[in-house]
Amino acid sequence: MYKTWRLCRTHTVGGLCHDGSHRFVSTGGAKIGKKFENMNQIRDYLSRPVWSVHEYLGINTKEEKLEPPSAEAVKKLLRLSGLPLEGADIKEIQMRLAKQLSFINKLHNIPVEGEKHTKEYDARLVQRNTKQLNYTKLLEGISHQKQDAELGEVSGSWKATGLAAESKNAYFVVKEGLLKNRK
């Protein structure tokens, strides 16, 4: 689709772009679709539904097929969320939770094109095989960092204890009676 992508910084006054973020710039000439001419075209495009929630809610399925959570689980959820137990329609809440769980299960079962590629960037609660970060790797990573003068970063300019009322040898001084003797 794109020939190449590169990360670049857009510089303006003071070395920062107007929103302080990095921008992606395409060096290729990719065409996605017709260019929008005005805000009405954008609103029309965004208001057109691509898919309906009703497809995945299972409204046509009978309520007997749904497996509602137990009444004890619903009461526990109500207590944990701080909602009142008194006057709560437990049966209605069970059916709503069953429909929501059914919807979530159907979303998880939707086939995704290029699933091998998307698994690397999966944001679901999936265990990832990451390498453990230890103290030596952290120090090694810090040693390779350099300040960017274009962004106004100056090496050694920040002192953590600079605004502290009392400090000694670049450490904060905490007195025992600090919170006890407050007025």
From Swiss-Prot:
Keywords of the record, alphabetical order, are:
ATP-binding, Ligase, Membrane, Mitochondrion, Mitochondrion inner membrane, Nucleotide-binding, Protein biosynthesis
- Main location class: mitochondrion
An example of a Gene Ontology cellular component annotation for this protein is: glutamyl-tRNA(Gln) amidotransferase complex
Q: What is its EC number?
A: 6.3.5.-
Membrane topology designation: Peripheral membrane protein
Q: Which GO terms describe its molecular function?
A: ATP binding; glutaminyl-tRNA synthase (glutamine-hydrolyzing) activity
Q: Supply the name of the protein.
A: Glutamyl-tRNA(Gln) amidotransferase subunit F, mitochondrial
Native source species: Saccharomyces cerevisiae (strain ATCC 204508 / S288c) (Baker's yeast)
